[in-house]
Structures are given as structure tokens and as C-alpha cells.
């Protein structure tokens, strides 16, 4: 029991710091906030300092999280499996929207689909798992591409070979013009650009570094996407991609 109490004391102290409270705390403050006596707090802090889990400012003697925490958190984040985390949420999204939902990631200079949940319309279109497409090939791809850093975007654009899926397919030039709009709105649209009769809306997923790592799209038969349905699907898509991003360690805010 004594060992358990000691472990709980350590956790209580470490949990005083979170992403919303990046502050330094003094010995008295920590003791008051946790209800642990100062002598015990001091011993715990000294032990945590040895392992670089906390650091102390020599000027004001206050404590904050150390680089050891960063190493531990990085190990956790590296083991996060995007598809495993996203799949149950994408199933919920598909159920809520009653449309097909797809998930894809970057594969060198292209986009590859890694998950798909069919909607009630069971429409067949160019987004099977394992399918590789250029970054102008659909809403999910464009959503991810537009949120890459400018250096990567320029690199991909230079190697991009244009392919027409339909008469409405947008090539390199149109994609460049669309990037700013997608970044501003937080979502992308694909209006029969890959499959005739199919409309899709896409949004990115971010990781703990704030980097775009994936794109999600809600797609269905264009005739069923009334302005009202499109707005509902957009809100649901942004909500669910934000939830997935948070689970991947992202700390930014959701787009409205």
C-alpha cells in the first residue's frame, strides 16, 4: 500500500502540468495543489530531476517538465497506429453521414487509400484500399496535399504527372490555385473530378507536431448532396477529423 501511495504521489505531481498550463511551479505550490507534505514533494522532485522528468529554474527555484517527459511521449506517439485509431471513428462518421468514408496517407509523391467504410448507397468509385492516386485525385488527397509544408508541395508539384480521370479533373495549375482556398476553409471539394456522378468533401488529419499526416473524405452520389446535406456532412467531417487528430496528439483547434 505504501508503494502504491508513493506511485500515486508521483503521478499527482506530474499531472499538475498539461498542455494548457505550461507554467513553472514552486515547492510550496506543488505541496498545496497536491496535498502532499513539502518534505515528500521535495524528495519526489529530486528523484524526477535525476531522470530529467522535471527541471528546476536556478533563478526562481521553480519546477517544470523536463526533456525526459518528451522522450517518453515521443515513444508513445510513434506507436500510435493511425488506421487502428481512426477506423472506429470513421465508421461512426459513415453512419452519421450515410455516405462512404475514405482515409488515405502520403506515399512519396502520391496519395494511397488505407481504409474505406462503405455508405448505404454502396456506390463504387476510385478509392479502394491500396489504390494510389495523384494528389489532385479527389477530396481526401487534396485536403492532405494542401496542408503539407510549402517545400513538400513544390517538390511534389515538380514531379506530378497529370492524368485526366474525367472532364472535370483539375490538374497542377488548378490545384495550386485551390490550395489557399482549402487552407482557408479547412476542407476540400471534389465535384466529379475522379468519378462521374460522385461528389466528395475532404479534410486533413494532424499529428502531435501539427503536421498533416492523412486525408479523410465523405463521398456519395452527387444528386443526394443537397446544399443542406453538404453543410451537415462538412460539419461532421471536420468534427471527426479533429477528434482523430486529437487522438494522434494534435493540440490545435477545430475549424468551424
Region spans (language model):
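Short, structured helix-loop boundary elements
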Residues: 3-7, 27, 62, 66, ...
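Amphipathic alpha-helical effector-binding/dimerization core
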Residues: 61-159
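N-terminal helix-turn-helix
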Residues: 1-79
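Extended hydrophobic
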Residues: 168-240
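Amphipathic alpha-helical regulatory segments at dimerization interfaces
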Residues: 16, 33, 85-96, 185, ...
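Cysteine/selenocysteine-centered motifs that mediate thiol-based redox chemistry or coordinate metal-sulfur cofactors
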Residues: 155-156, 238-256
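Hydrophobic packing within well-folded, soluble alpha/beta domains
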Residues: 30, 41-44, 48, 54, ...
Amino acid at each position: 500500500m505504501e508503494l502504491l501511495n508513493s506511485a500515486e504521489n508521483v503521478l499527482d505531481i506530474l499531472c499538475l502540468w498539461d498542455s494548457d498550463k505550461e507554467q513553472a511551479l514552486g515547492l510550496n505550490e506543488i505541496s498545496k495543489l497536491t496535498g502532499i507534505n513539502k518534505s515528500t514533494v521535495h524528495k519526489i522532485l529530486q528523484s524526477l530531476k535525476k531522470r530529467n522528468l522535471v527541471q528546476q529554474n536556478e533563478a526562481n527555484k521553480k519546477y517544470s517538465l523536463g526533456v525526459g517527459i518528451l522522450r517518453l511521449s515521443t515513444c508513445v506517439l510513434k506507436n500510435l497506429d493511425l488506421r487502428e485509431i481512426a477506423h472506429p471513428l470513421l465508421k461512426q462518421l459513415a453512419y452519421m453521414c450515410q455516405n462512404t468514408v475514405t482515409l488515405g496517407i502520403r506515399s512519396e509523391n502520391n496519395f494511397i487509400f488505407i481504409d474505406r467504410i462503405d455508405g448505404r448507397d454502396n456506390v463504387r468509385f476510385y478509392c479502394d484500399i491500396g489504390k494510389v492516386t495523384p494528389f489532385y485525385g479527389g477530396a481526401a488527397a487534396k485536403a492532405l496535399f494542401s496542408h503539407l509544408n510549402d517545400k513538400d508541395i513544390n517538390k511534389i508539384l515538380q514531379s506530378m504527372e497529370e492524368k485526366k480521370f474525367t472532364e472535370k479533373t483539375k490538374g497542377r495549375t488548378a490545384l495550386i490555385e485551390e490550395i489557399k482556398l482549402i487552407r482557408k476553409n479547412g476542407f476540400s471539394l471534389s465535384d466529379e473530378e475522379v468519378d462521374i456522378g460522385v461528389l466528395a468533401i475532404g479534410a486533413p488529419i494532424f499529428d502531435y507536431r501539427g503536421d498533416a499526416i492523412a486525408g479523410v473524405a465523405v463521398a456519395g452520389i452527387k444528386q443526394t448532396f443537397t446544399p443542406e446535406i453538404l453543410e451537415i456532412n462538412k460539419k461532421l467531417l471536420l468534427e471527426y477529423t479533429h477528434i482523430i487528430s486529437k487522438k494522434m496528439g494534435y493540440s490545435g483547434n477545430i475549424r468551424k
